[in-house]
Amino acid sequence: MKITNITTYRLPPRWMFLKIETDEGVVGWGEPVIEGRARTVEAAVHELKEYLIGQDPARINDLWQVMYRAGFYRGGPILMSAIAGIDQALWDIKGKVLNAPVWQLMGGLVRDKIKAYSWVGGDRPAEVIDGIKTLRNIGFDTFKLNGCEEMGVIDNSRAVDKAVNTVAQIREAFGNEIEFGLDFHGRVSAPMAKVLIKELEQYRPLFIEEPVLAEQAEYYPKLAAQTHIPIAAGERMFSRFEFKRVLEAGGLAILQPDLSHAGGITECYKIAGMAEAYDVALAPHCPLGPIALAACLHVDFVSRNAVFQEQSMGIHYNKGAELLDFVKNKEDFNMEGGFFKPLTKPGLGVEIDEAKVIELSKNAPDWRNPLWRHEDGSVAEW
């Protein structure tokens, strides 16, 4: 079997799919994207395509190593996202050829179901509460919320009180009927993260995510030492080599590699194994589309340390398309009691509505995250 073509489709709301075709008619789908840099990742995919045409798609490990190591410069969000989507599609092809789901090819199940959680947007407490109520009606009881808005390097007590008040109102509205993590998005400095974490402890969040940027990872063990709340991070780390450093340093209780950013299934399964050796949990980052989610689920179901899975159903970014709009077998993604079950169809287990993909790719938006500025005019972290 040989690879004959690779096609990319930029899609609403902020996704990109790729299709790998073979000379035997077997097709694989992947999802390579950096939100806000889809065109750049697309260019990287087509650079890699030049080598991949004519290659055997069954040699996933060798193709991964060529894509990563054959160039003198490597790593980073763009290249690793391009590799990720290609890797997903190669696993999809292998599963279809062997008539088995990917998790079966990776050694079989270690669990029967995985807890799902949903991201809830909104800047005001009432908006967040309404969003949680809506998602509870479709089966969710675990969520992730913004921990704060933009914050100065050293900010005032009013900014701290605003962030704390939002979380307080949510806990008061739902008590212990729900669980939630708080995502700081790396928006705050280490000094302000210390203040916020201390103030938020009383509301017992499930975890604190990206209290500081990955570039400031040396602060993770320092922040972890001051709190009992688990610290999570990893969506902006792109290979096992970056995760190696944070695991050695300690501090993180949960790793959150993104299967569409960190080298795909092949790389993230290795990251999961590294995390298990350090007694660190796995919770793959996934505010993206159905192919990325399927890839995450296959890794979850073969990784003992996987604890829950993010998904984007109903997320506020989804303007123009919802999570399953491009999927024919929607029923396979149904949750039971807030849990996903294993996907059982061959490959990734996602049947893509290709006609719809082609149609909506014709006028896909070029999504960009907003530009935020502080009161003094300096650029703020989004």
Swiss-Prot record:
Mg(2+) binds at residues 183, 209, 235. The record marks 310 as: Transition state stabilizer. The record marks 258 as: Increases basicity of active site His. Keywords: Lyase, Magnesium, Metal-binding. It catalyses: D-galactonate = 2-dehydro-3-deoxy-D-galactonate + H2O. GO terms for molecular function: galactonate dehydratase activity; magnesium ion binding. It is an enzyme of class 4 (lyase). Binds 1 Mg(2+) ion per subunit. SUPFAM superfamilies: Enolase C-terminal domain-like, Enolase N-terminal domain-like. HAMAP family: Galacton_dehydrat. Catalyzes the dehydration of D-galactonate to 2-keto-3-deoxy-D-galactonate. Reaction proceeds via an anti dehydration. This is D-galactonate dehydratase. It comes from Enterobacter sp. (strain 638).
